[in-house]
Amino acid sequence: MALKVFNWLNRKKHSNVEYCTINENKAMEEKEDSLRASVTEQDTEALLLRDVLINGILAIGTLGHNVNSLCPESCIEQDEPIIMCDEKVEQEKCEEEKAEAKQDTPVTAPSEPASALEPAKMHSSSMKEDNFMCFVKEEILMHGMEVEDVPNIQERPLLMLEKVEKVRTTLADLFAAEAFSSSDAEDKCYPKIVIVAGASTSKPTSCMEKMHHKKPTKPTSKPLKATRKLSRVMRKMLGKKIHPEQLNGRSNAEGPVTA
């Protein structure tokens, strides 16, 4: 409130208004023009403020410019006719150049250079077509490899491995290797024998024979008769002061018999 009062006093003291006589008709026309200008300015400002946020982006410094410059659709619509005009101009230029070239070339000119150039053009075009076809075939093959099923791709390494011959070691190979190694060991164990006149020619025992030589086992005893078994058991019991009936689980009230 204090600022408003201060501004009012400042305007009253420092008034720069110049009074002069003006024709009423001119004043009315100027007033109408100013009103129209203010209305149009307000409308454009409102449109600009409405179009400031295009696609969620705040455009700073665009007030006072053309509204259509803020709309991308209008820009695209303006660019399309320009592009079409450029294309038409280029086509017209090409047609004019072709017509001039036809006029410049004489009708009675020999056709030998043209016929010489035609095979070269045909060869180059055929080479381009072949390259293009090769490229297309490679692309199709690559696409087919990508589209193949996963199980086929997983089975392929297994199939490739089956084609390779595997060398397997069998039991026969192991036994043969063991026999070969044992024969080598026997050859090493045999010392060099020098035959001397009058000496014995008996071969010394090999190392493997000594290793495999077993100690003589004791002869198994013959089975004892029933009477001998019983007598042996009776001796043991009498020596330990045990009655024979106690072995069968019977209890004697009188106690064991002492010898």
Swiss-Prot record:
Top-level taxon? Eukaryota
Report where it is expressed, by tissue.
Expressed in the leaf sheath pulvinus, tiller base and tiller node.
Residues covered by region (Disordered): 96-123, 206-226, 239-259
Map motif IGT motif onto the chain: 56-62
Q: Which GO terms describe its biological process?
A: morphogenesis of a branching structure; phyllotactic patterning
Q: Where is the composition biased (Low complexity)?
A: 109-119
Q: Does the keyword Nucleotide-binding apply?
A: no
Q: Which UniProt keywords apply?
A: Growth regulation
Q: Do you know which PANTHER family this protein is assigned to?
A: NAD-DEPENDENT PROTEIN DEACETYLASE HST1-LIKE PROTEIN, PROTEIN TILLER ANGLE CONTROL 1
Q: What family is it from?
A: Belongs to the TAC family.
Q: What does this protein do?
A: Involved in the regulation of tiller growth angle. Promotes horizontal shoot growth. TAC1 and LAZY1 play opposite functions in the regulation of tiller growth angle.
Q: What else is known?
A: Plants silencing TAC1 exhibit erect tillers with a very small tiller angle.
Which protein are we looking at?
Protein TILLER ANGLE CONTROL 1
Organism from which the protein derives: Oryza sativa subsp. japonica
Taxon lineage: Eukaryota, Viridiplantae, Streptophyta, Embryophyta, Tracheophyta
